[in-house]
């Protein structure tokens, strides 16, 4: 499981830069690190191997082609201008792997890049970023998702998150740990977000389409998934934003960072997360109104069905009588709060075993009432970017779903 312990990049967030860096507020970094340590330990205690993204990146930066690939993603920023781009490239080329990794993640300010010159450099404020930090790297599920032995590297729609995907691409291309893996999707393609890809069952993949993932990306991913023999059905699930009801519990003026149901694009995994072979945590306002189109391969292309209720389409594709729904809350107000705190973004470590933020009291109670064992972890600061345990994890290997103690 790839995770990223928050570090210096989170300390770069100020009240002024919150919106630009996709956070709702300035996080308490020390507490966020403590919460993440507890999360990682919970994964280990459950028998999951934890891989830290920072360590993987440092290892990868030992290889010249990987360095070139990562640096190129930085220098592609059109705001730099030719002169500053050349100077920055020379500066990055001279850094050791550890320092380069730190700069790629935490960013670089004008004051820290003292050898710069030229018009662009002079017009920057002392604390303006020459290289933007990547505080959203915390959510490793967004930048890549594994489908069997194949990895789909995201192509983020938001400019502030695109470098995350390029760093993951460099790791998968050059780190010995991932030698032989096949890439199904790349950051240069149509917008696709890992948080929109949900594995419902062996052979069945649901992909949300909306503000993060386009229909064109869904089509390309579906073709490649079928060609790889990983799935027989891909469900296309629209996740367009909806007006926020007065009782939704969503904070006024809120704009989604990682994805919410009301008022901004939502990741599919904040709406629906599997917690058993036949059960999913779902936002109650959408569970029975969400639709899906079933996509399957045929000789001359793709077969696309008419829209169906999501629950019916999912059950049919999964070969079960029905997909059980575990609501995130009791009523519209409670459900809205649960969604805002990513109550549905639980991490399933196996059938009937899930990791959830302890703050999601109502959702956790409902999970346990449905027979799901809940591993509670602190998340008051980790949730400041509106993500959850599932979003903070990227599984790179899974045991068969029939195994009693481990799953998808």
For each feature predicted by the language model, list its residue ranges.
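The feature marks the mature, well-folded catalytic cores of soluble enzymes
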Residues: 1-408
């Amino acid at each position: 499981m790839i995770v990223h312990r928050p570090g210096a990049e989170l300390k770069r967030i100020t009240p002024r830069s919150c919106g630009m860096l996709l956070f709702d507020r300035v996080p308490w970094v020390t507490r966020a690190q403590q919460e993440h340590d507890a999360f990682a330990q919970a994964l280990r205690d459950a028998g999951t191997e934890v891989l830290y993204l920072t360590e993987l990146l440092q290892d990868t930066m030992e290889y010249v082609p990987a360095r070139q690939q990562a640096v190129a993603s930085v220098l592609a920023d059109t705001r730099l201008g030719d002169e500053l781009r050349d100077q920055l490239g020379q500066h990055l080329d001279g850094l050791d792997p550890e320092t380069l990794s730190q700069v790629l993640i935490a960013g670089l300010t004008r004051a820290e890049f003292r050898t710069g010159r030229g018009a662009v450099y002079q017009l920057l404020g002392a604390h303006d970023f020459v290289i933007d930090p990547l505080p959203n790297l915390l959510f490793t599920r967004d930048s890549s998702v594994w489908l069997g032995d194949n990895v789909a590297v995201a192509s983020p729609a938001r400019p502030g998150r695109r470098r995350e995907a390029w760093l993951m691409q460099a790791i998968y291309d050059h780190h010995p740990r991932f030698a032989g893996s096949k890439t199904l999707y790349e950051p240069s393609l149509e917008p696709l977000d890992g948080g929109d890809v949900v594995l419902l069952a062996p052979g069945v993949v649901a992909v949300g389409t909306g503000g993060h993932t386009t229909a064109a990306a869904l089509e390309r991913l579906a073709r490649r998934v079928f060609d790889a023999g990983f799935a027989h059905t891909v469900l296309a699930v629209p996740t367009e934003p909806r007006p926020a009801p007065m009782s939704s519990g969503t904070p006024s003026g809120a704009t989604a960072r990682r994805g919410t149901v009301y008022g901004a694009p939502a990741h599919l995994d904040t709406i629906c997360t599997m917690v058993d072979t036949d059960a999913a945590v779902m936002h109650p306002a959408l569970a029975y109104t969400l639709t899906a189109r079933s996509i399957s391969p045929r000789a001359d292309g793709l077969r696309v069905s008419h829209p169906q209720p999501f629950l019916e389409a999912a059950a049919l594709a999964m070969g079960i009588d029905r997909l059980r729904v575990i609501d995130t809350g009791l009523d519209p107000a409670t459900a809205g709060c649960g969604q805002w705190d990513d109550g549905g973004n639980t991490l399933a470590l196996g059938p009937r075993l899930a990791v959830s933020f302890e703050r999601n009291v109502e959702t956790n109670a409902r999970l346990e009432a449905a027979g799901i064992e809940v591993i509670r972890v602190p998340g008051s600061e980790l949730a400041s970017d509106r993500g959850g345990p599932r979003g903070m994890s990227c599984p790179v290997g899974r045991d068969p779903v029939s195994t009693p103690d481990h799953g998808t």
